[in-house]
């Protein structure tokens, strides 16, 4: 039985006996020589539809008959042997395995890379913040061991200014070895420096080291 497609000027050869790749190649060349702007994206669905329609497959059963499965296997192998390496014909596996595997593989690589970058960035920043906080508390306890060791809750109480003032006195009078003058302390204690690096816009200075020291 010969069929005539509205896209083609001439009749098609019996689609059930001729390889659809040959049909596509012939029609593509004929359209190119005739000046028609049709592409394989337009031609392919019509040829595929005609080819499958002439196979008289029974899709009413769950998986088709044995003969239908054999025809589908032949159809898959023919489409996989496409003469167009970059065309969509290689993806016309009736199971969809070829297309799905490629799409999932590409998406998996992209998602894996994004997740890896996000996790590494998040872990690095959180680790830095954690060590900064730990180092700050350690410095405060080393500088002012008395009040903080006896009552660590001072860090979260209203008495914190007194603790900081005591810490500043200890630091300025016993730790800082730079000569004091009317200018601010040049060495800056670690807590101030860490907070200032984390939040450059803040004026955080719990020990008030930026104030001129008394003569």
Swiss-Prot record:
Source organism of the structure: Arabidopsis thaliana (Mouse-ear cress)
Keywords, A to Z?
Mitochondrion
Task: State what protein this is by name.
Answer: Uncharacterized mitochondrial protein AtMg00920
Additional remark text: A stretch of 270 kb of the mitochondrial genome is duplicated within the centromere of chromosome 2 resulting in the duplication of the gene. The expression of this duplicated gene (At2g07678) is demonstrated.
Q: Name one GO cellular component term.
A: mitochondrion
Question: Where does the record say this protein resides?
Answer: Mitochondrion
Q: Which domain of life is it from?
A: Eukaryota
């Amino acid at each position: 039985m010969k069929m005539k497609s509205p896209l083609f000027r001439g009749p098609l050869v019996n689609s059930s006996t001729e390889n659809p790749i040959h049909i596509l190649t012939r029609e593509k060349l004929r359209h190119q020589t005739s000046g028609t702007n049709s592409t394989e994206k337009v031609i392919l669905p019509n040829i595929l539809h005609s080819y499958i329609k002439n196979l008289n497959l029974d899709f009413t059963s769950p998986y088709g008959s044995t003969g239908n499965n054999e025809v589908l296997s032949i159809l898959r192998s023919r489409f996989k042997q496409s003469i167009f390496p970059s065309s969509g014909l290689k993806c016309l596996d009736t199971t969809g395995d070829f297309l799905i595997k490629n799409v999932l593989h590409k998406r998996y690589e992209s998602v894996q890379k994004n997740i890896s970058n996000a996790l590494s960035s998040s872990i690095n920043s959180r680790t830095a913040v954690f060590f900064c906080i730990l180092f700050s508390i350690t410095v405060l306890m080393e500088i002012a061991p008395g009040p903080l060791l006896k009552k660590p809750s001072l860090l979260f109480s209203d008495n914190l200014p007194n603790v900081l003032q005591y810490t500043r006195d200890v630091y300025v009078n016993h730790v800082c070895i730079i000569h004091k003058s009317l200018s601010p302390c040049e060495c800056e204690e670690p807590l101030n420096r860490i907070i200032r690096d984390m939040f450059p816009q803040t004026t955080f200075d719990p020990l008030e080291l930026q104030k001129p020291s008394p003569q």
